[in-house]
């Protein structure tokens, strides 16, 4: 994005890319469908980003979610909106988005140097000297858009942090964000692969209750899925911890406890000769129902034998299934990275370094991170467009 907008501004642009092609991480976004952005307003984005929102406000006004959709329409990527407000290409292909961006770069005369990583950047007077392989390149301005340290197989290995630090920048310690969570409970392995389209997960952080909602999946060592990834953003600064963080999962958020009890009473009456795990099959998958019965101590109990306190226990487990979170999965498994270049050292109106004039930043390398749903790609587009559009020969 920076290359396109810089070229449109009249700059001669060279992109140094250590991979064989650019945009490899883009191919993973949205499960390969590329969740381009979210339909919210600028104020919605600012609110979601919390403390970082003020820093991002200007770039979002300069290149808003609506402007993003218009831009992609101009490069022949038609978009659509799902029921959650997430914006995808009509083709549902991240590969198409990658191709369109590279094709636009080609049309604008952007030069690419593939297969060469940047080993160092030094500033001599008004010029930068970039060491990349066998020869050095010189430039009047440099935009570092190397991403974070998550998904290193895509080339995102934290190289940009070292380059920025060598030029005087402060790096906020990188941590995994939007990442699966590891639990103390080993029974999660028995449920690995079982998912729920919608759950609500609640916990206490700094004496305040916080909740996230969305799809979830059990994994071999814990839990994953969009709701869990959003929760991980809130927990990553507290993990790993000496004492696990307790969370409660509402497996049936569409029903309150009274409605759930009423429904369950009807099921127990209708299927009085069945064991409880089989009675729960319309609410949760059979394996999950079996686990709930095991936790309630009623594995072999028939519906007709269920006592009131046992029924209350089942309802409690369906509405507040307890889990103890020990740690996040490694940063290599994270969708994005928390941390990076301190926003205090970047001019929010230009994305230019306050430490090293002529140096700019865009995307995940900056210390901002958002939830699932197109928020992080929008920040990549907005910071990239802003860093690029002010460049001139």
Stretch-by-stretch model annotation:
Residues 113-114, 120, 290-369:
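A glycine-rich dinucleotide-binding beta-alpha-beta segment and adjacent secondary-structure elements
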Residues 7-31:
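Glycine-rich FAD pyrophosphate-binding loop
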Residues 113, 132-141, 211-214:
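Core beta-strand elements of the Rossmann-like FAD/NAD(P) dinucleotide-binding domain
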């Amino acid at each position: 994005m920076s290359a396109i907008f810089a070229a449109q501004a009249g700059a001669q642009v060279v992109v140094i890319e250590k991979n064989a092609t650019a945009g490899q991480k883009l191919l993973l976004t949205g499960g390969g469908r590329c969740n381009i952005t979210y339909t919210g307003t600028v104020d919605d984005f600012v609110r979601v980003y919390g403390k970082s929102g003020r820093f991002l406000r200007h770039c979002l006004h300069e290149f808003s979610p609506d402007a993003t959709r218009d831009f992609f329409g101009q490069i022949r990527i038609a978009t659509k909106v799902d029921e959650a407000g997430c914006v995808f290409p009509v083709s549902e292909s991240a590969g198409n988005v990658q191709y369109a961006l590279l094709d636009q770069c080609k049309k604008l005369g952007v030069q690419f140097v593939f297969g060469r990583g940047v080993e160092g950047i030094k500033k001599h007077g008004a010029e930068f000297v970039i060491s990349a392989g066998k020869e050095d390149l010189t430039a009047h301005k440099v935009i570092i858009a190397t991403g974070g340290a998550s998904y290193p197989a895509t080339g995102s290995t934290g190289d940009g942090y070292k380059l920025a630090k060598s030029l005087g920048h402060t790096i906020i310690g990188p941590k995994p964000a939007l990442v699966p969570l590891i639990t103390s409970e080993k029974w999660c392995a028995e449920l690995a692969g079982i998912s729920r389209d919608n759950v609500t997960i609640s916990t206490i952080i700094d004496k305040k209750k916080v909740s996230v909602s969305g799809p979830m999946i059990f994994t071999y060592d814990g839990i994953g899925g969009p709701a869990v990834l959003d929760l991980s953003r809130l927990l990553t600064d507290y993990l790993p911890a000496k004492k696990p963080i307790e969370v409660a999962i509402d497996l049936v958020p569409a029903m309150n406890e009274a409605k759930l009890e009423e429904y369950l009473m009807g099921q127990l009456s209708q299927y009085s000769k069945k064991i409880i795990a089989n009675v729960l099959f319309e609410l949760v998958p059979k394996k999950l129902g079996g686990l709930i019965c095991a936790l309630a101590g009623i594995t072999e109990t028939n519906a007709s034998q269920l006592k009131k306190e046992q029924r209350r226990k089942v309802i409690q487990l369906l509405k507040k299934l307890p889990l103890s979170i020990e740690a996040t999965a490694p940063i290599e498994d994270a969708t994005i990275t928390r941390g990076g270049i301190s926003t205090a050292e970047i001019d929010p109106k230009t994305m230019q370094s306050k430490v090293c004039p002529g140096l700019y930043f865009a995307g995940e390398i900056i210390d901002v991170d958002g939830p699932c749903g197109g928020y992080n790609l929008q920040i990549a587009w907005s910071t990239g467009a802003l860093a690029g559009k002010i460049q001139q020969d």
